[in-house]
Regions:
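A short helix->beta-strand "capping" segment at the edge of beta-propeller domains
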Residues: 27-50, 210-222
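Short loop/turn segments that connect beta-strands within beta-propeller blades
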Residues: 78-82, 131-135, 199-203, 264-268, ...
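Beta-strand-rich domains and repeat architectures in extracellular enzymes and scaffolds
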Residues: 40-75
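Serine-hydrolase catalytic core recognition
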Residues: 345, 390-711
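A flexible loop/linker signature enriched in serine peptidases of the S9 family
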Residues: 47, 66-75, 92-100, 113-128, ...
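Hydrophobic beta-strand positions that form the internal "hydrophobic ladder"
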Residues: 62, 109-113, 156-159, 242-243, ...
Length: 711
């Protein structure tokens, strides 16, 4: 397609005669019809999407993002009658459509704060507050940069949010990196800080005297210093301070060594916890989701081995607000906590991944929570759903009323499109979606375009491993089918059942086109506890690959899969696994490696996030190069025989394009069928829908060529 750089070894003059014969023997079918693939991809996201959902603090109303032909809009309605919804917007006219979202309720439930670009369409989002008395929304800022995570102060007088002034890109390592220029690491570093806007009682908030392009109006201020990059924050209960996770710039690289800070408004930051310096199980790990206890004495957070900011999993920890030794509240629990919030001073509600289920539990604290004497007990799950849940803010986050009698969230599975649900702690609920109250029915009657899915479990090296198997659409047990193994990124992440697909490497698309698809959660994944997540340290490509291969054997033993037609794919860490596995085994007859890593030694000096590697490899590449060579596909490239398609974005900072070039070049030198496709102006997470579609089309064509088409 236009704009895509395609590098191929399809020139027959390049191959030796033997290599050409081998390639021909492995090609059981011609490329499939692209028109048919397009039709399948278009049908994957049928139904209406559900955006962010927020229940009001008094539990009487709900705000949500509703998709429409002109984008998403904010709707508000009584929780017991969502049909009576009204639009909340900064638009001056009813027919004006803006990009709006990230709404948050005021503590008194009488107003919503949200971001909107109505004042500068397509250019800049500003903060607005809309009172629910019918008066127009107030614009409270004149910003110039990237914004996210608004949060009202507990007293309702201010809204804080994360802000990158003068940003040229979204914050984080997933977005396309800026072209390298100037003094690297010093020039043009973009720093995310907590900004603060005062909410006026009435009247216009815009300061028309502010210089053009500046954010200095009478209501705006920065709460955190310019020498700290802030990732997450939480208000102190008295509204006079913050707790936040932050690190020295550059922010993309240093999240893995971030510290927990507290700060009085107008004061200086105080680092109360540095995982690199503490002793015990938290040493050298990562922290996320800081939550201040209602009495202000302690801060709870999630700590664990995490490979990516925003992909949170670990144990629930607590530390005194004055600092000191942290306490693990959930040691040896066989789950991965992802989000939590306090319910009084003695309880925490925790959203966690348990095997293939997302569930909400209540954690009871006994003793002095600001000391080492605190103990915990667990209640039965409020709900446990074999699917994806969340309120649209962060992974597994939920929206609750102030008294925590109601939790509202969206949920979907491989079989059910997203709807909004309600859970009430203390009520008797069964497992699955049947155990919660469905509030919306906008997708009633919508059926999946792909096959049935099942949760598989198996044993590998003493570990209990879970994964998802998608059957081909219109599955016939009398037929034999090809199998595609899709390995997730991370590695600290997990495949959770969810609706939709169609962009990038999509399991639902492969299933819709007639393939079995195995999505394993091998050691290193979330869902089985912190010991399981840490089980691949200094072992990339070995124990986790064994888990995957045992999963393949489990599928072969139970389903009519042709063992000679098994393919492998994945993105990020899954891209690494796709590169490495084909140097370790000949079981895969074709592979598609997306944004992978082929040489950990060269990667260490190329990427924008090298801080993540030391917790996994135990030392830097300069101190222990052998540990990095052991996990590198390039080390074993002479053993690679599998035809492999390689795809990557040219501005990927997490898994830079040179890693894909290096692997492609090595395969080409070894006369292994390969092709490299580079997508312009793309980072680690592709932004252009046309590029995401193109990746999927090429992957289907590659697998069809070497595995044969699905049913």
């Amino acid at each position: 397609m236009a704009g895509v750089v395609l590098v191929s070894i399809s020139n027959p003059n390049f191959h030796s005669a033997a290599a050409q014969e081998m390639a021909a023997a492995k090609a059981p079918s011609a490329d499939p019809d692209r028109t048919h693939i397009d039709e399948v991809l278009k049908g994957l996201n049928r139904g209406h999407s559900v955006g962010q959902v927020e229940v009001s603090p008094d539990g009487k109303r709900m705000a949500w993002l509703q998709s429409g032909k002109d984008g998403a809009e904010i709707r508000v309605a009584p929780l017991d009658d969502l049909a009576k919804s009204e639009r909340v917007t900064a638009a001056a006219k009813a027919d004006q459509h803006c990009h709006e979202g990230q709404m948050v309720w005021a503590p008194d439930a009488q107003a919503l704060a949200f971001f909107s670009d109505c004042a500068r369409p397509g250019e800049q989002a500003d903060l607005y507050v809309a009172r629910l008395d019918g008066s127009p929304a107030q614009r409270l800022s004149k910003l110039n940069g990237y914004v996210e995570q608004p949060a009202f102060s507990p007293d309702g007088r201010s809204v804080a949010f994360l802000y990158v002034e003068g940003a040229t890109r979204s914050a984080g390592a997933l977005a396309a990196m800026k072209p390298w220029s100037g003094v690297i690491g010093e020039d043009g570093v973009e720093i995310q800080r907590v900004a603060l806007v005062t909410v006026p009682a009435n009247g216009s908030a815009e300061d028309t005297t502010a210089p053009a392009g500046k954010t200095l109006n009478s209501l705006f201020s920065f709460a955190t210093p310019a020498n700290l990059h802030v990732y997450e924050f939480d208000w102190r209960p008295d509204s006079r301070g913050l707790a936040y996770v932050a690190a020295d710039p550059p922010g993309e690289n240093n999240w893995w060594v971030a510290k927990l800070y507290t700060q009085e408004m107008g004061g200086k930051p105080n680092a109360i916890l540095a995982p690199a310096e503490v002793s015990g199980a938290l040493h050298g790990l990562q922290i996320a989701v800081p939550r201040w206890s209602p009495d202000g004495k302690a801060i709870a957070f999630i700590g664990g081995l995490m490979s990516d900011q925003g992909s949170t999993g670990g144990d629930v920890w607590i530390v005194s607000a004055e600092g000191g030794q942290p306490v693990d509240l959930t040691p040896q629990r066989p789950t991965s906590a992802a989000w939590m919030e306090w319910a009084g001073n003695e309880h925490l509600y925790v959203s966690e991944l348990a095997g293939g289920n997302c569930q909400l539990i209540r954690l009871h604290l006994e003793g002095d929570k600001a000391s080492q004497d605190v103990t915990t007990t667990f209640g039965s799950p409020v709900f446990s759903i074999p699917g994806a849940v969340g309120d649209g803010r962060m992974e597994l986050s939920l929206s609750s009323s102030a008294d925590h009698s109601i939790f509202v969230f969206r949920a979907s599975t491989f079989d059910h499109p997203a709807e909004v649900y309600e859970a009430k702690p203390g009520t008797v609920m069964s497992a699955g979606l049947e155990g919660v109250i469905q509030l919306t029915h906008q997708n009633d009657g919508v059926e999946p375009a792909w096959g049935k899915s099942v949760s598989l479990e198996w044993k590998s090296d003493g570990f209990h491993v879970q994964g998802w198997l998608m059957l081909p659409k219109d599955y016939d047990p009398a037929k034999r089918y090809p199998l595609i193994v899709e390995v997730h990124g991370g590695p600290a992440a997990a495949v959770v059942a969810h609706w939709g697909g169609g962009g990038g490497l999509s399991a639902t698309a492969f299933s819709a086109l007639g393939y079995f698809v195995l999505q394993p959660n091998p050691r290193g994944s979330y869902g089985q506890g912190e010991e399981f997540t840490q089980a691949n340290r200094k072992d990339f490509g070995y124990g986790d690959l064994r888990d995957i291969l045992v999963g393949v054997d489990t599928v072969l033993a139970k389903y009519p899969v042709d063992a000679d037609r098994v393919g492998l794919t994945g993105w990020s860490y899954g891209g690494f696994m796709s590169m490495f596995a084909v140097t370790q085994t000949q079981r895969f007859k074709a592979a598609v490696a997306g944004a992978g890593i082929s040489d950990w030694q060269s990667y260490y000096g190329e990427n924008s996030i090298d801080q993540w590697m030391v917790p996994y490899f135990g030392a830097s590449v300069y101190d222990d190069p052998a540990a990095y060579a052991k996990a590198s596909a390039i080390t074993f490239i002479k053993q690679a025989k599998t035809p492999t398609l390689v795809v990557v974005g040219d501005r990927d900072g997490e898994c830079p394009a040179p890693q894909s070039f290096e692997f492609w070049h090595a395969l080409r030198a070894e006369h292994v069928p390969t092709q490299l496709v580079v997508y312009p102006n793309e980072g680690h997470a592709f932004a252009d829908p046309a590029h995401r579609r193109d990746v999927m089309v090429r992957a289907v064509e590659w697998f069809s060529r070497y595995l044969g088409a699905g049913s």
